[in-house]
Amino acid sequence: MKPLIALVGRPNVGKSTLFNRILRERAAIVDSTPGVTRDRHISEGFWQGRAFRLMDTGGYAPEDGVISNAMLEQTMTAINDADIVVFVADARAGLSYDDLELAKVLRQRFSHKPVFFAVNKVESPQLAYEAASFVSTGYTEPWCISAKDGSGVADLLDAILLEMPESDADQEEDGAIRLAVVGRPNVGKSSFVNALLGNNRQIVSDIPGTTRDAIDTRFTRNQQDFLLIDTAGLRKRTKISAGIEYYSSLRSEKAIERCEVVMVMIDAGPGIEKQDLKIINMATERKRAVLLLVNKWDLIEKDSKTSKQYEDTLRSHMGNLAYVPVLFISALTKKNLYRAIDTAREIRDNRARKISTSALNRFLEEALAANPPSSKGGTELKIKYMTQIQAAWPVFAFFCNNPELVQTNFRKFLENRLREKFDLKGVTISLRFLQK
């Protein structure tokens, strides 16, 4: 993951203006009304060739009403998740009680994190002089900046760059298969993990959203190491409040980015819903392999045909995602728990497999014989050969006379045949057509 920089401070100190200045775009709403930024805003930025994620947060105002309390929770969670914190104050408004309180929290609870204290709106020598009063926060060397005109921002970013950690993408390449357990709240993710590991490692209750953090657990099965990431439930965006729940959802998305196989869990009772499909899409968009786990299967009245009928109904709702394998489990009775892990390992191994060019071209010859591509505009598509490109997921290159002649149905045909031929169920694959 790219390092995360969080902008925190009271409402209306200029965090959103600084956010936009750093990103050189108006990505956040800027308004003179305190507290306009109630939700988080996260975008990717670059400075001196280094990439990072920048987070704008709602204002820290602990003495105000319910909304501000949610914004306070948001600020605390943002600080906890961030690699670097930029604490923003307002030179025009002067030092406030809330500034002192936030400074106290940062020094006492987050002393292990790099904190840059930026006094914003310093747009005159007089304001620069008055900014000296902010040393009473305990930060004796505040950065005097103006997010509005950009003065001091480059120097601040240069200093931040020196504290910025390297991306941790390469730090997890230790041979362990990385699995993420994701799904809507209260579908049984933590019960699944606890049953699998044989301990009550997490609080399990009927209250949706009990698990707020993404929690990593290592275990070994059949001499293979696994890293299991259990996450907070992913709700619809419209149901995510302005506080801690959004950040729980953010952690789930981060877990998907970190893993190789996403185990999407649904509740057998209500079945698959739009949000489940969005979660699967989120995983496939990030080119992750996917396994669909139907939990609480023990609660379903069934006969010998039930699982087949249920799976058929699932796939009818999944459309282009119908290639995702389905496994019926019960965290309560431990039905198919280890089979889920073994299946995830098999999917991951297939995702990492390199298929020889000779095998691919034999496949291509058979596929073209079975379903020759139709012509387009009187011109016939001619595919000369194919190969697999080196990537973290299977990417297949087809060399042809004109890539624009490739029609959607034919592309889908090749994708389906590749999955069948080379056992790529659950694996996101990419097809690229290149002119030769």
UniProtKB/Swiss-Prot annotation:
Positions bound to GTP 1: 9-16, 56-60, 120-123
Domain (KH-like) ranges: 353-436
InterPro entries according to UniProt: G_ENGA, GTP-bd, GTPase_Der, KH_dom-like, KH_dom-like_a/b, P-loop_NTPase, Small_GTP-bd
Binding residues for GTP 2: 183-190, 230-234, 295-298
Pfam families linked: KH_dom-like (PF14714), MMR_HSR1 (PF01926)
GO biological process: ribosome biogenesis
Span of domain EngA-type G: 3-168, 177-352
Entry coiled-coil feature ranges: none
Gene Ontology terms for molecular function: GTP binding
PROSITE patterns on file: G_ENGA
SUPFAM superfamilies linked to this entry: P-loop containing nucleoside triphosphate hydrolases
Keywords: GTP-binding, Nucleotide-binding, Repeat, Ribosome biogenesis
HAMAP family: GTPase_Der (MF_00195)
Family statement: Belongs to the TRAFAC class TrmE-Era-EngA-EngB-Septin-like GTPase superfamily. EngA (Der) GTPase family.
Role description: GTPase that plays an essential role in the late steps of ribosome biogenesis.
Assembly and interaction partners: Associates with the 50S ribosomal subunit.
Record-given protein name: GTPase Der
